[in-house]
Amino acid sequence: MTMKRKKISVIGAGFTGATTAFILAQKELGDVVLVDIPQLENPTKGKALDMLESSPVLGFDANIIGTSDYADTADSDIVVITAGIARKPGMSRDDLVTTNQKIMKQVTKEVVKYSPNCYIIVLTNPVDAMTYTVFKESGFPKNRVIGQSGVLDTARFRTFVAQELNISVKDVTGFVLGGHGDDMVPLVRYSYAGGIPLEKLIPKDRLDAIVERTRKGGGEIVNLLGNGSAYYAPAASLAEMVEAIIKDQRRILPAIAYLEGEYGYEGIYLGVPTILGGNGIEKVIELELTEEEKAALAKSVESVKNVMRVLE
């Protein structure tokens, strides 16, 4: 029997999609198919070819193709969805809902048709609602449809903590709960630097400022760029999740998972600590929360539900 490389399709060849494809190829996680709409087929092919031509220099073996034909994605092991319109300065995530929901429905139909056994990771904003849309549209079990926000939000939190303490980011661990928006809940009590609780290392006022900056992290970059939104850190976060599934690493990572009673919520996609491995979301980890944290999470859930109400 011939051993085959894994196949990963990335839907949406904008900054985030293309960067994700490039990181996946560099990590040799599988062959990569980069997909966009027919009007953008040539630029998509150009990006894929450009990446492929870097492989002799960077020393990775992975085939990368660009296409607008979903038939090229057939039998993908993992499909990453980054397609959708981007958020512009002054635009709330909620403004994106109706347009991106239509895009999610179209994309999901094609994905399911050609890769009925794949795992789907959704990045498109507002990500909690878009992941729910893909879940409903696909008919897949909940463990195979996953949203990405917590890895990114936690990466931002870890970055700011490392800067504050002037230490390696590798030594900082943390968790962000809830929706991917201004009401996310960075769990300071469960965050450490070199195994030492952050509360022992950083004064409360500084920690509060870091939490606030984490909440506004996406908006900070949108405003600095002036056009478009973050893509390097989101792409790296997607690649970490893809790697956890493909290599069956059983990583404890924050992910947007479908809740059926965990944390007291039902029938909603929300950012929670999960075990991510070869079977997708293998477990939702329930942490003990203080009353204050529960209240913050409830506020975050309400924000997600407000977006969900816009869904058609």
From Swiss-Prot:
Positions of NAD(+) binding: 12-17, 36, 100, 123-125
Modified residues (Phosphoserine): 149
Catalytic residues (UniProt): 180 (proton acceptor)
Molecular function as annotated in GO: L-lactate dehydrogenase activity; L-malate dehydrogenase (NAD+) activity
Keyword Phosphoprotein assigned: yes
InterPro entries to which the protein is assigned, alphabetical: L-lactate/malate_DH (IPR001557), Lactate/malate_DH_C (IPR022383), Lactate/malate_DH_N (IPR001236), Lactate_DH/Glyco_Ohase_4_C (IPR015955), Malate_DH_type3 (IPR011275), NAD(P)-bd_dom_sf (IPR036291)
Function field: Catalyzes the reversible oxidation of malate to oxaloacetate.
UniProt similarity note: Belongs to the LDH/MDH superfamily. MDH type 3 family.
Protein name: Malate dehydrogenase
Lineage, top ranks: Bacteria, Bacillati, Bacillota, Bacilli, Bacillales
